[in-house]
């Protein structure tokens, strides 16, 4: 005797929904971590050179960080810029955060996730 009828389609749908909810929570967590890094003056340090929404006392050396997803539709381009902008522009003042090991690959990806929300 089965107490619960077997409904494979329902079980699959519930599993997919649960997986999507976990993925969304992880993405939000990464964005929060990226925001912390971007505003941390001793680590990501974006505010030293860039103005961005929610940042206090921003610098004005670099461009304002807004409409990032529209300006950089290719996420990998933004990752490469943060990792080592000198490859694209040898005269840049932007530190090569990845090449100099200021930020890890995971931290750069978190910052990019955050910047894409601006």
Model-found features: residue ranges?
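N-terminal alpha-helical segment
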Residues: 30, 57-61, 90
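C-terminal capping alpha-helices of c-type cytochrome domains
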Residues: 76, 81, 87, 99-118
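Positions in alpha-helical segments
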Residues: 32, 63, 92-96
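Gly/Gly-Pro-rich "capping" loops immediately C-terminal to redox-active cysteine motifs
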Residues: 39, 47-83, 99
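Extended, non-globular alpha-helical segments
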Residues: 2-7, 77-96
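Electrostatic cytochrome c docking/interface patches
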Residues: 22-41
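N-terminal export/targeting leaders of redox proteins
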Residues: 1-28
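Cys/His-enriched microdomains
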Residues: 44
């Amino acid at each position: 005797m089965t107490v619960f009828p077997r409904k494979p389609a329902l079980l699959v749908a519930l599993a997919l929904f649960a997986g999507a909810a976990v993925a969304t929570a992880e993405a939000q967590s990464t964005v929060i971590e990226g925001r912390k890094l971007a505003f941390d003056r001793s680590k990501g340090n974006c505010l030293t050179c860039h103005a961005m929404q929610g940042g206090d006392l921003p610098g004005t050396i670099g461009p304002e960080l807004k409409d990032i997803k529209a300006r950089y539709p290719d996420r990998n381009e933004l990752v490469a810029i943060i990792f080592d902008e000198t490859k694209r522009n040898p005269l840049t003042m932007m530190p090569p955060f990845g090449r100099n090991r200021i930020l890890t690959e995971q931290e750069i990806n978190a910052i990019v996730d955050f910047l894409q929300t601006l």
